[in-house]
Amino acid sequence: MAKIQIKSEKLTPFGGIFSIMEQFDSTLSSVIDSTLGLRCSSFGYQYSEIVRSLMSIYFCGGSCIEDVTTHLMNHLSLHPTLRTCSSDTILRAIKELTQGNISYTSDTGKNYDFNTADTLNTLLLNCMFASGQLKEGEMYDVDFDHQFIETEKYDAKPTYKKFLGYRPGVAVIDDLIVGIENSDGNTNVRFHQKDTLKRFFERFEQNGLTINRFRADCVMSTTLPPQSFTVLPLRTARPLRCSMSAGLHGISR
């Protein structure tokens, strides 16, 4: 005869997320709070708890931030020690971490907004080192390009791709994003690209990221003269090589 046991524990179809939440907490929570600072001294949620809650939404199949309140809270709150915050708290924290835009004026008098997101870009690198995805002392190849992101937000501008959106510059190592700097969708890709790259490479150097080669699309050859590559870090394990992709007229050092 089969034995039937009555269990009093609560069951959840999302229990698999708990081990990921615990790994996140042990690996990244201290890095997040030390980089962003403490959000509260007593009651309330720290930034690490908010980022973990945001991560859990998408790991559990959610499609928007509000899903944590409407669908997931009853399940995620079953964890005995790790707290999950509401969608309102997540949205407030995102607004708190927003950095103001930098406005540049072109020769024709038009203004274009850039958002450097310095603190969040620093956090991105810190988390990659803490999680072992990047390692100090290793040499890395950095690729840079611009992306066009379609959006219907109030500040979206018309792009040359015939839709409204943003035009972030993105730096990657293999498949890891190591820097993002947003700008208006109607900004020419050449416009103040040198300043974007300077900020990226200064941040890489400050965080101990050793660059072997740098690659970018062909617009670099007409945007930056060779002397502009002094923005690249020189304190590397061996002489820095700036390797440009085809069509860059052999700019190297």
Regions found by a protein language model. Name each.
Residues 179-253:
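An internal, acidic/charged active-site-proximal segment
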Residues 1-163, 170-188, 193-207:
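Dynamic "connector" segments at or just before major functional cores
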